[in-house]
């Protein structure tokens, strides 16, 4: 297949403040599936990932451990790369922002922007969030805390360099409006436009003097470059960009990037800061930035103190690499956060991998061995039922291509497994064991087994981008190779009289939850013990079980209502498609909520708990038929349901499983 041209894609580079959990690992697996699929389609792919290794947070972490920042990031970067390799990811370049070539170019870029007048020297006095490496004004805080992560901010006053963001704002707005594919999903675009660009951009602080772990400004070395100007530029520096005009052939071939794949929490940096930096450098903008959702443990953020952090290597130990890949790819919706629990992983392993796929391959090969000594042959004895099987199998390629073109990877995997589901149905329809009892139907039996083997061979090739090791194993057991893209809509390419393996390997043996869950509990216990040891070593108070698991609250009972009273209330699942802070209020958010075919505007007092960015894409429970009322002068047409603890902390109620917007709550 001839090349369709270049495809340069990147993940966000992982921040080296600690070991990545499964939610972080999801991104590299997602990127790998996209990269493998693009190669299958015929693209010349260059896939870059790596680690972000500078900043105050890392300096403080290293200080806590009594080692240098470089020693600290060397350890964490090594761990990140180990996990990326464990997950069988096919990146072409693993970058580190402490690499000498990157640091050299960052200094040049800073100087170039300074000489151009886009960076100027001033002084900063305001507020700084160390975990987010972000600057904020008082008006941007939510209840006095960082609007991104909810943590405390610290006063900061220092000499600093600033970038003239407002100079390029109108140009960026025009680009976003004329390139609807630039920010995906669309809900992320709406966030950036409504919450940042349209209200107006402030100049950005791009240097610090209060810590030293960073790339020094070449002409003013008491300053270090702000971590985001450092980190974002890796996408060009590590493919050979040179600010002096001597860029490499690799850069000239691959820039602009075709895809930046990032978490939704850092989309602001990639769709506002980064394109403006590129405009200032007179470079073209990336073609698309996709902000993927988060993977949450049982609907809540992972915490070492709770022992609920899930790491990729623990999942691999229990389920294997491809089963881990399958879960994170299959369970993540396009826009909404995904849910992971150990119990759900076991359920998917047994139902999808062991039953639908593994059992199909094993049964088919076993029947070929039992009835024909492993020889697979098409006899031409066809029946009407064969046509539908062939249509499903040969039609899958284009359906998957359509899903992958929109980065709907979970939907693409579902299409692959629809091939295997159709094969299982075909076995039930043709009943090979019945055909085997009648010698006159031997040729028909041979045709049935050929059709199954050919379908599985095509299915394995379609599966290869997502579960590469499993695809290779299936092809090996069928004694054939994986096919190219142009062959995946053709039926009948499996060689006649080919022989399958005599002893099929069990791809995925069913798991007994009673055996798995004790191992999970041991992992949780080890995590909590490690966390407590870390807390004690750093002199911090260890959170007690009672504090962590305060599980019950009694509230004042209200007057009883009748069943008829209750039935007057209409509850439905809603999907938040836009959200912004209500002006002149520190508590209120205004959300546009899709409920079925209609969109309602709902004002909620949850600004303390959620940022507008976090809200977009959530599926929530809504009281739909509440009489409209104005809150802080803004019309509200319903109510989002929340739970409240004894401290007044609120948490939105969300469906346990992904449900369509408009589904009735009953």
Residue spans of the language-model regions?
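N-terminal catalytic cores of NTP/NDP-binding nucleotidyl/phosphoryl-transfer enzymes
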Residues: 2-76, 95-110, 115, 132, ...
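Intrinsic disorder at enzyme termini
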Residues: 471-565
């Amino acid at each position: 297949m001839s090349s369709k041209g270049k495809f340069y894609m990147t993940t966000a580079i992982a921040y080296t403040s600690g070991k990545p959990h499964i939610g972080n690992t999801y991104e590299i697996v997602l990127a790998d599936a996209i990269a493998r699929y693009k190669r299958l389609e015929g693209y010349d792919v260059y896939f870059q990932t790596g680690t972000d290794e500078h900043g105050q947070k890392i300096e403080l972490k290293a200080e806590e451990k009594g080692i240098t920042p470089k020693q600290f990031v060397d350890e964490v970067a090594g761990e990140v790369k180990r996990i990326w390799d464990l997950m069988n990811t096919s990146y072409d370049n693993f970058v580190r922002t402490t690499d000498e070539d990157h640091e050299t170019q960052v200094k040049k870029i800073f100087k170039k922007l300074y000489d151009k007048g886009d960076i100027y020297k001033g002084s900063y006095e305001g507020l700084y969030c160390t975990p987010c490496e972000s600057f904020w004004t008082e008006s941007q805080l939510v209840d006095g805390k960082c609007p991104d992560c909810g943590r405390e901010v610290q006063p900061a006053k220092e000499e600093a360099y600033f970038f003239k963001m407002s100079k390029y704002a109108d140009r960026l707005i025009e680009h976003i409006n004329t390139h609807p594919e630039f920010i995906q999903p669309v809900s992320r675009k709406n966030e950036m436009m409504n919450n940042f660009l349209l209200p107006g951009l402030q100049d950005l602080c791009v240097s610090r003097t209060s810590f030293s772990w960073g790339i020094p400004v070449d002409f003013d070395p008491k300053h270090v470059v702000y971590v985001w100007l450092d980190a974002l530029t890796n996408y060009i520096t590590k493919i050979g960009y040179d600010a002096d005009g001597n860029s490499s052939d690799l850069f000239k071939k691959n820039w602009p990037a075709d895809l930046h794949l990032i978490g939704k929490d850092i989309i602001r940096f990639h769709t506002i800061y980064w394109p403006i930096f590129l405009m200032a450098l007179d470079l073209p903008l990336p073609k698309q930035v996709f902000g993927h959702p988060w993977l949450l443990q049982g609907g809540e953020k992972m915490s070492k103190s709770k022992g609920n952090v899930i790491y990729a290597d623990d999942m691999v130990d229990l389920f294997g690499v491809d089963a881990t890949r399958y879960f994170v790819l299959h369970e993540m919706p396009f826009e909404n956060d995904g849910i992971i629990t150990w119990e759900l992983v076991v359920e998917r392993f047994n139902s999808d991998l062991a039953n639908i796929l593994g059992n199909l391959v094993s049964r088919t090969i076993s029947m070929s061995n039992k009835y024909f000594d492993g020889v697979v042959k098409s006899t031409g004895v066809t029946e009407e039922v064969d046509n539908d099987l062939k249509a499903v199998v040969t039609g899958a390629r284009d359906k998957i291509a359509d899903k992958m073109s929109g980065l709907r990877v979970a939907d693409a995997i579902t299409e692959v497994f629809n091939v295997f589901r159709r094969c299982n149905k075909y076995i039930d329809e043709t009943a090979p064991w019945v055909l085997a009892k009648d010698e006159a139907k031997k040729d028909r039996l041979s045709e049935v087994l050929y059709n199954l083997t050919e379908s599985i061979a095509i299915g394995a090739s379609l599966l290869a981008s997502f579960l590469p090791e499993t695809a290779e194993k299936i092809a090996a057991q069928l004694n054939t190779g994986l096919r190219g893209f142009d062959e995946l809509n053709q039926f009948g390419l499996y060689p006649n009289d080919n022989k399958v393996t005599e002893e099929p390997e069990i791809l995925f043996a069913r798991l007994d939850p009673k055996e798995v869950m004790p191992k999970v509990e041991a992992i949780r216990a080890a995590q909590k013990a490690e966390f407590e040891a870390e807390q004690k070593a750093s002199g911090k108070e260890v959170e007690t079980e009672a504090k962590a698991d305060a599980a019950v609250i009694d509230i004042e009972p209200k007057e009883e209502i009748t069943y008829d009273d209750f039935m007057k209330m209409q509850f439905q699942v809603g999907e938040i498609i836009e959200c912004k802070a209500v002006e002149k209020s520190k508590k209120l958010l205004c959300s546009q909520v899709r409920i079925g075919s209609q969109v309602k505007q709902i004002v909620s007092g949850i600004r303390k708990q959620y940022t507008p960015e976090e809200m977009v894409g959530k599926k929530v429970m809504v009281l739909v038929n509440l009489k409209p009322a104005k809150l802080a002068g803004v019309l509200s047409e319903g109510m989002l349901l929340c739970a409240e603890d004894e401290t007044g902390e609120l948490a939105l109620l969300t469906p346990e499983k992904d449900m369509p917007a408009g589904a009735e709550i009953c």
